[in-house]
Amino acid sequence: MYIQILGSAAGGGFPQWNCNCVNCKGYRDGTLRASARTQSSIALSDDGEHWILCNASPDIRAQLQAFAPMQPARALRDTGINAIVLLDSQIDHTTGLLSLREGCPHQVWCTDMVHQDLTTGFPLFNMLSHWNGGLVWNRIELEGSFVIEACPNLRFTPFPLRSAAPPYSPHRFDPHPGDNLGLLVEDTRTGGKLFYAPGLGQVDDKLLQMMGGADCLLVDGTLWEDDEMQRRGVGTRTGREMGHLAQNGPGGMLEVLDGFPRQRKVLIHINNTNPILDEDSPERAEVVRRGVEVAFDGMSLKL
């Protein structure tokens, strides 16, 4: 299984266009040793030619341009994208679909709840129906697993995560299973397994068991501290309120990952305020000391 990190930042990217926090300002001033990052998205393949896009960020055009296999040039109009899987209906995971309209029809896999959001509060399916067949919905059931024809050796097992629907959603304050998903992806030839959960607010025993059976854990790296947004003066909500488990402290993501010494562990969906973006910070050093990697745009993994 080929795993390509197209984008590794949380919503807004890094540096965020309107932010002058210590990280964003330091990057622009050249006083911070860090890499710019686009908004979170990955691509998966079983042969390096046919790719499944997981989430479509607003930065999708630049992400595809930076990864040559996404333009195989086999025809006058071509793409390496063969299907799209949406883990939720968040704006920073779906607006990239608008930029992909010239390539319609696209096979899009998502849950009933995500499809409902994307036909009501943010009606992308309706809007893009006017472009050559638009978005073709394939339902993700919350039980069992599924295979996408373009990559027949990859088996996807979805699992619901506890988190809210987007602010625009008609059921924002009425959460349902299927609003947010993680994925366990297995290459049935190699046996390699990826646990992918870029929005992980709570880890229960069932998830711990799934993580223990995976070879690579690609998980939520949004915040270092739960109250980081408040500390930095850029927001009022905590990580838990937004559905993100912070890395630091008792019960934090690093402590969770300490329990998996065998697995490759990678943090993704990193907010612009997170000090681990600073490659010289003590927080980054602590992450490295504990055997955890920080995802970057263009990172390639293979299982």
Swiss-Prot record:
InterPro entries: Metallo-B-lactamas, PQQ_synth_PqqB, RibonucZ/Hydroxyglut_hydro. Keywords: PQQ biosynthesis, Transport. Gene3D superfamilies: Ribonuclease Z/Hydroxyacylglutathione hydrolase-like. The keyword RNA-binding does not apply. Pathway: Cofactor biosynthesis; pyrroloquinoline quinone biosynthesis. One of its GO terms (biological process) is pyrroloquinoline quinone biosynthetic process. It holds the Pfam family Lactamase_B_2. The keyword Ubl conjugation does not apply. May be involved in the transport of PQQ or its precursor to the periplasm. Belongs to the PqqB family. PANTHER family: COENZYME PQQ SYNTHESIS PROTEIN B (PTHR42663:SF7), HYDROLASE C777.06C-RELATED-RELATED (PTHR42663). This is Coenzyme PQQ synthesis protein B. The lineage of its organism: Bacteria, Pseudomonadati, Pseudomonadota, Gammaproteobacteria, Pseudomonadales. The gene is pqqB.
